[in-house]
Amino acid sequence: CRYNPGGVFELGTDIMDNPGEAKFGMTKEQLFEAFAILKEKGAKTFGIHSFLASNTVTHLYYPELAHQLFELAVEIKEKLGISLDFINLSGGIGVNYRPDQEPNDIALIGEGVRQVYEEVLTPADLGQVKIFTELGRFMLAPHGILVTKVTHKKKTYRTYLGVDASAVNLMRPAMYGAYHHITNMMNPDG
């Protein structure tokens, strides 16, 4: 079941996202009710999932999300007698799109999740719970490249370069102003 804790998800003084505005997921009360019904109907495998932020560039996101979900797993066990089989931490680990940004350190993130696992799940006799992730952007984005060629140049009050690619090839900048670094392969240092 997908859990939506509601409210605003913050790390320190930074607002990461606003789960309370999302249509996805269940409240804690809805999740407990759903699990009780599933248990009564004979379900044998249970898991939870949550998605609180996207493209976070901090090593604190996953450990904080893990802490919330691990505490919820303990509460599910105590109140419903259900030991979860898995917890899906979803995605959300971001990449450094700008050359001056520090990349996320996946080892540091993993260590943070491991510490929370041992602090919360292991003492509650939930040390067998599998942890899943969805690290598509983190794993693939650094390896995606759009190669395009300048086809013409136009000067008015500014200089414009026409290329043999369009928003169809890379929608994110046109759609919501996302930054993607450009390297001139004829002058990579310029």
Predicted regions located by residue number:
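Conserved, mostly hydrophobic/aromatic
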Residues: C1, I48, L89, E134, ...
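Active-site-proximal beta-alpha core segment in soluble small-molecule metabolic enzymes
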Residues: C1-F86, V95, V116, L121, ...
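Glycine-rich and small/hydrophobic secondary-structure elements
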Residues: I106-V120
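Charged (often Lys/Glu-rich) extended helix/loop segments that serve as interaction or gating elements
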Residues: E118-L121, L126-G190
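Short glycine/threonine-rich loop-to-helix capping motif typified by GTGT followed
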Residues: T58-L65, N96-I109, L140-H152
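Flexible glycine/acidic-rich beta-alpha junction loops that bind and position SAM and/or redox cofactors
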Residues: G7-L11, D85-Q101, F132-H143, L170-M171
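Generic secondary-structure boundary signal with a strong preference for alpha-helix termini
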Residues: I37, S54, L65, E102-N104, ...
